[in-house]
């Protein structure tokens, strides 16, 4: 016997259950912010029905992720692809905690950011974090590559490919005693992977849009990637950012695409 447990004005079955078979389903997203009592619904399912013990804490997660980041990098160097958005900022805070001076934050200015954003990013990450910071002015290079391009997916491909080349150029400059920078850390989160139909979903999801940070490396560019947030959703990333001590104006800032105004503007940006 299946019992309908929730309905709406337009949907006769919003949730249903079969207690005998231990099946509980919803036809909506309880995890999203505008689902009233969604968090309580999930809590009831996990702790009352499944019998899980609530022994997880954000402090424990911070310690675990810091240790994992430190172990991954070892004695090597890492550059952090920093956009100033919440995702890359959280990875920057985590990396600063884990490996400090072994990490260099690299901010690629493609000239398509919000007004005052490059200055704000540099202000925050040179004064609040004990890490090296490099501001790469690549505005002219991007303007030349994007001239006349109107297709959004092509813009993303161009921007993502050029990003890899810019980061690799910085990595080569940072070589010490012939030892290359091995790792590149970036703020890839799970929705990026889902929307791209990318590698970690097993390729079983449809491509909604490609993400510049998931574009394949061009020939001649090679890094080992560190993506500590690749199983996190945005609300979890924000909670982690607060636990790491990031200021609220970074953690709760309005999301903005990595390719910036190139995607917000319809047609060519030249």
Question: Which residue ranges define each predicted feature?
Answer:
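RNA-binding accessory domains that recognize and position tRNA/RNA substrates
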Residues: 1-182, 198-270
């Amino acid at each position: 016997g299946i019992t309908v447990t929730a309905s709406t004005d337009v949907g006769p079955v919003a949730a249903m259950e079969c207690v005998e078979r231990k099946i509980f389903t919803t036809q909506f997203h309880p995890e999203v912010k505008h689902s009233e009592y969604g968090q309580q619904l999930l809590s009831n399912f996990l702790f009352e029905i499944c019998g899980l013990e609530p022994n997880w804490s954000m402090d424990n997660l911070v310690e675990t992720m810091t240790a994992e980041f430190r172990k991954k990098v070892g004695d090597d160097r890492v550059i952090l692809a920093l956009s100033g958005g919440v995702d890359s900022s959280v990875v920057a805070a985590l990396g600063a905690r884990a490996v400090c001076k072994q990490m260099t934050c690299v901010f690629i200015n493609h000239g398509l950011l919000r007004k005052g954003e490059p200055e704000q990013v540099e202000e925050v990450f040179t004064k609040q974090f004990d890490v090296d910071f490099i501001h790469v002015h690549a505005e002219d290079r991007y303007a030349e590559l994007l001239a006349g391009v109107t297709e959004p997916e092509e813009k993303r491909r161009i921007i993502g490919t050029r990003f890899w080349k810019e980061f690799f150029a910085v990595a080569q400059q940072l070589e010490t005693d012939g030892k290359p920078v091995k790792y590149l850390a970036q703020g890839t989160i799970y929705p990026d992977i889902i929307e791209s139909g990318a590698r970690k979903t097993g390729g079983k999801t449809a491509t909604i849009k490609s993400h510049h940070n998931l574009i394949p490396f061009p020939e001649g560019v090679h890094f080992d990637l560190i993506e500590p947030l690749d199983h996190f959703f945005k609300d979890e990333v924000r909670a982690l950012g607060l636990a790491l001590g990031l200021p609220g104006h970074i953690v709760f800032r309005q999301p903005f695409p990595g390719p910036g105004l190139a995607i917000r503007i319809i047609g060519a940006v030249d």
